[in-house]
Amino acid sequence: MSESHEQLRQRLLQSQQTVLQAVAHMDAERIRVLVNPGWTAQDLLAHLAAAELGHCAVVHRLLVGEDTAIPGFNLDTFNNAEVQARRHLGLDELVAEYNANRAATLDLLASIGDDDWDKAGPHPGGFDTTVESVFRVITIHEKRHLRELQVAH
């Protein structure tokens, strides 16, 4: 791993620990507190778990040279559908999914070669990105949502 890989790995691990700490002591009442319009703390954890898969999919497409732009794609609609699909899951199940998805992200990061780092394309969030940047976006995205999770404390 290059230093950049290791720095990103550490950022991802630290961000994961911060998310897990934010939900670790939430009881059934707190996990159902609205933290933004329409989403509870539990929904937000579901969103973070689902977003991880989406970010990995973007990286995979960039690596093989596939177009990452999806005609008619609406990020808000996608995010809401992913959260809705996980509403039946309990907190422990969501934490397990989040952890499994983060492990897959770390495995993907470890597989990135130096020639792949700068492969670029559009991100579903509406901006241009590179393989490297997608990993950075994951931690930035979580940091933003961590502020919302803190509302439930």
Residue ranges and their predicted role:
Residues 2-12, 38-45, 91-95, 131-135:
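Amphipathic, non-membrane alpha-helical segments in soluble helical-bundle scaffolds
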Residues 9, 20, 42-45, 56, ...:
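Non-transmembrane alpha-helical segments in soluble domains
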Residues 11, 15, 79-118, 136:
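Acidic/histidine-rich alpha-helical segments that form the ligand environment
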Residues 19-22, 26, 112-115, 152:
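A short secondary-structure junction motif
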Residues 31-77, 106, 117-153:
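Short, contiguous alpha-helical
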